[in-house]
């Protein structure tokens, strides 16, 4: 697990010579538009990969492929097993560079499939599982030992990160694929729990984590609440002790009693 962008994962773990490229990266692609929202300034995962390389220039020349997707392959927003592979793309940041093959593939859009076509959850999971196998098979065909993945299909596409992570875990643990090293690049943000959910699911890889993320999160929240309650109780005790000390009757200096009473 990496709390980092896909580009950073490539720069940290890829090779600096194209002829020695041993890594592939999955671009969380738009199925119908080259680079997703890159030209509009959107910085999703695919757009960020475009910003750090010449990837968009290559994708922009494949408009016939994207047009074919729009006309014939929307498939109730599940899309189909179609991908582009851009070999040995150079990624640059701050005078550091590395190369990776880019697998341009779109996850099913669960949000639209549910809303517009009432696709069942089982059908959505089957489609995503099949798409994951499709991507891993492409990586095998490329012969790459390293693969950068992430929270593919989550957030705007409508899949829960824990579900996606478990599907990836199961396929990678199956032994059906040849990739030797997988980097899940999932930047942590305050807007979602993708990183925490992936980290939880993959904590015991290749074994399945028997506890759900919700159970672990609930236990952690209860522990935090107990700590806060204990701290508040201790603060109340300290304040009460201070009030007692401040307002308690004081004895005259030297222990002497007053010489007169009125």
Set out the residue ranges of the language-model regions.
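Macrodomain-like recognition of ADP-ribose-binding/processing modules
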Residues: 1-262
């Amino acid at each position: 697990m990496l709390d980092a962008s896909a580009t950073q994962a490539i720069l940290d773990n890829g090779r600096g010579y194209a002829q020695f490229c041993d890594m592939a990266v999955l671009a969380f692609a738009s199925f119908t538009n080259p680079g997703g929202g890159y030209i509009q300034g959107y910085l999703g995962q695919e757009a960020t990969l475009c910003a750090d390389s010449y990837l968009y220039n290559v994708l922009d020349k494949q408009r016939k492929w994207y047009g074919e997707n729009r006309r014939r392959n929307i498939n109730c927003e599940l899309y189909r097993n179609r991908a582009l592979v851009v070999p040995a793309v150079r990624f640059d940041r701050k005078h550091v560079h590395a190369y990776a093959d880019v697998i341009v593939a779109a996850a099913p859009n669960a949000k639209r499939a549910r809303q517009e076509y009432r696709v069942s959850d089982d059908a959505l999971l089957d489609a995503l599982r099949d798409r994951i196998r499709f991507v891993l098979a492409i990586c095998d065909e490329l012969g790459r030992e390293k693969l950068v993945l992430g929270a593919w299909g989550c957030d705007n596409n409508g899949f829960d990160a824990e579900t996606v992570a478990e599907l990836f875990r199961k396929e990678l643990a199956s032994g059906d694929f040849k990739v030797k090293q997988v980097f899940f690049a999932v930047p942590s943000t305050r807007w979602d729990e993708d990183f925490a959910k992936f980290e939880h699911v993959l904590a015991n890889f290749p074994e399945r984590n028997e506890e759900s993320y919700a159970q672990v999160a609930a236990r952690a929240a209860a522990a935090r609440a107990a700590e806060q309650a204990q701290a508040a109780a201790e603060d109340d005790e300290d304040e009460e002790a201070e009030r007692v000390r401040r307002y308690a009757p004081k004895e005259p200096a030297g222990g002497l009693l007053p010489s007169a009473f009125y």
